[in-house]
Amino acid sequence: CAKDPIYFSEKYIQIVHVDHGLIPIKMYDYQKEICTAITENRRVTVNTSRQAGKTTTAVAVILHYIIFNDFKTVALLANKGDAAREILDRIKIAYEALPAWLQQGVIEWNKGSVEFENGCKIIAGSTSSSAIRGKSISFLYIDETAFVENWDEFFASVFPTISSGNTTKILFTSTPNGLNHFYKTCVGAQENKNGYIYIEVP
């Protein structure tokens, strides 16, 4: 379970379905590919179509990460803070639906952050905020990466906090938005030039 995020996700994680309420996750192959890629590698960039279940995948990956690690900080960012907090809300719902023996004790349970007794934290915010500046980040997840404005300035401010560790992880997921920073990251990954694993979800 600790070493297999796919088994953990399909066995224990539930998500809210519009018609059926809480339902177990049944992962598609590409979701399994993303889970495996970010578990086995440090940097993954996912070029995805809309409504492709990327948020569900992120919920599964992050929940597994904070349950089975100690003293890790996850930064969950999006170009809009509300979008990041919505993903955090989904993680909270999935966490509350876990069996009691899998849950960690909760220290902090706020709108924009959670902290557990194993020392793990999740911070949600916009890429334009100072939410994670100066913090030591173990896992950086950016949703809709292609739509982040002032990318160079933003990434220059956060990269030192994630490059200092030997096991830190970065996960980008986004729909395309022209030939910008996300496009360049994806191309670099495809050409094996930047250390990212590239996954495309048509």
Model-derived features: positions:
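Phosphate/NTP-binding elements of NTP-utilizing enzymes
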Residues: 1-202
